[in-house]
Amino acid sequence: MASKLDFENQKYYIDFASDNGLEYLELEPPWYGDEDGAINRPKEYDITKPVPEIQLPALFDYARSKNVRMFLWTHWENVNRQADVAFPLFAKWGAAGVKIDFMNRDDQEMVKWYHMILKKAAEHHLMVFFHGAYKPTGTQRTYPHLLTQEGVLGNEQNKVTYLCTLEHTMTLPFTRMLVGPMDFTPGGFRNVTVEQFRPDMNQPMVLGTRCHQLAMFVVYESPLMMVCDDPAAYRNQPGLEFIKNVPSSWDETKVIEGKI
């Protein structure tokens, strides 16, 4: 969930994660620069220089004291330019890994780039998940620290479009999910009907029931599951205990029934 990135604000998120047994927190932009610039003008930014307001080394120390580890969001162009310096620094800070975004290609050059970056991340014991990514092709078999990747129209689209329909979410297990883990970001708790739904950047809604969103944690495959809503949406709500207790991976899945 994107939010104001200063030290006190992120402590709030770390505390929520710790209180609810969530192992990881992802720092989105603008941890190293303003959000618009980090996304649209990556060449102007340096992912080894966090903004002062976040007090990043101290934030890592605080997260560690709460048994929460952090992933750092990065634009792929910055990673391409700075991985040799940034990855050892991220490891020194204590980062669990990186979320790399906005590749938006699957040509041969980019596929080779994925492999190169995964090798570099492995050298520094950093886990990886790709956003703005192409569909999986079995790469996680060679690089098990690749946890998941997007390549799917997920819940974030509810902020700006009407595209994440119930029909779409019910079809994914039979289509996109067949090729590998997908970072759909389930767990929206502002559940509404088709008639009530509207795109909302600040308090995104999701179509369908609470149970529909919770079922995604079981049916959708992703060893790293995101909890997509904000703490205020979850507190004292039915379903939070399920999210706290459901595992993200298991040894065997038995399909009882399912068809399109």
Residue locations for each model-derived region?
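Catalytic domains of carbohydrate-active enzymes, especially glycoside hydrolases
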Residues: E8-P30, L89-G94
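Glycan-recognition and catalytic regions of carbohydrate-active enzymes
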Residues: D229-I260
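Hydrophobic, well-ordered secondary-structure elements that form the walls
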Residues: A17, V128, V219
